[in-house]
């Protein structure tokens, strides 16, 4: 064997011994310096990395590629139903079926569990406390997005999550011209479902990830409860550069970069709010919307009997670029 061939084999062996750097193989991490993430979880800038199967930053940090949902190794402690029973679900989302709620009868426990089954890492990663915090954080963020509560509401404002299933009074079709995710004629991409999925550039990749054409059928997010929950879980589980996935944050798989730390973005529930709506809610001191998200989170953690963790707000965090 020639010296060059021997070097190549040794280099390959060293490479294989190092953990993957990005994408689904690395908890949804993105590559530094706008490099592409290959289908195999490695960073680079050639067609081997940026071509077919590229997971993120396929055209640099300006876009390209389809965000990939990470599927971390489950802890082996059972599915999400082992963390949240039907009775607990009903207690947490106490007034979702109130007669005044637009979504009455829509958000069912069975749909929640079925959707979670399509994302094996959701609510199954890490210790029991980590799993509980993930479910609490997910339901808190989505409860804020769909809340029907008010300050003097029966049982408190934080008992009224999941009251709405679609945006009220939408005045835009939320269509951004895109060759990759073209809008269908006559369709609107306003907020729907638990996370209030908006814009064609989110409906497109969400639909591809769950196997449904949501560009042509966006109303499914407000008419099929399992599809609805799946879109929210897709958003939760999927890193979109430069943001990590909410799942990676709450399960402790995200390590903030120096840039993140300089911006005040450190692990905790607060950075998830930054991921969801940081451009509007974070970085300018106290904000009632951030406080509302925290209120839901604390209530759900209390019901699940788990600690809140640190860094709950994003008042002093700069939004992700």
From Swiss-Prot:
The EC number of this protein is 3.2.1.14
Question: In the record, what terms sit under GO molecular function?
Answer: chitin binding; chitinase activity; endochitinase activity
The record's active-site residues are: 145
Q: List the record's Gene Ontology CC terms alphabetically.
A: extracellular region
Keywords (alphabetical) are: Antimicrobial, Carbohydrate metabolism, Chitin degradation, Chitin-binding, Disulfide bond, Fungicide, Glycosidase, Hydrolase, Plant defense, Polysaccharide degradation, Signal
Q: Which residues form the Chitin-binding type-1 domain?
A: 20-60
Its domain of life reads: Eukaryota
Q: In which tissues is it expressed?
A: Localized in the aleurone cells of the seed endosperm (at protein level).
The record's similarity note reads:
Belongs to the glycosyl hydrolase 19 family. Chitinase class I subfamily.
Q: What is this protein called?
A: Basic endochitinase A
